[in-house]
Amino acid sequence: MTTTEPPKGLDSALTKKIIKAASKAHVGVFKLTNGHIGSKWRVGAGFKKPAPTLLLEHTGRKSGKVFTTPVLFLTDGANLVIVASQGGMPKNPQWFANLVAHPDAVVHLRGERGRAVRARVATPAEKVALWPRLVDMYADYDKYQTWTDREIPVVILEPR
């Protein structure tokens, strides 16, 4: 895997605080408007080609607390596909570890609240098949993969 230099400060404490605050605001607006505002990601590659966004309710692996996180998604038949890119940061996002520990989750889509799903990590073959579609949806995923040494996981959310 080829690694290029990520932006300076990507993994800084300040960046993490900004992301946390922005995510909290995103969740609040999405819930308030039932996804009519917040269901499209318009940052980075999403500025010119907005990417669909859902809210992911997942259970903390240590706390048991329910967390809600905005995540970009791709529809693949009855499944939803999400990417644990964390913007190319060195570590996987917390929601990924939570889904591995507690795969049952709930997603909220524009105009739809409370779809029950079960998460699983895509197999290597599934990831190879899905990655071009994911990059077509949000081109920055390819760039994020070059910023980190970790293999960015792809997660499939299946209906339950």
Segments (PLM) and residue ranges:
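Short, conserved active-site entrance elements at the starts or edges of catalytic domains
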Residues: 16-61
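Short beta-strand segments
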Residues: 51-87
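Long, non-globular segments of proteins
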Residues: 2-25, 157-159
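Short hydrophobic/aromatic beta-strand or adjacent loop that forms the aromatic wall/cage
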Residues: 53, 152-154
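Short secondary-structure boundary/capping segments
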Residues: 45-46, 72, 97
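Short, structured beta-strand-loop surface elements
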Residues: 5-9, 86-141, 147-151, 159-160
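Hydrophobic side chains in beta-strands
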Residues: 58, 75, 109, 157-159
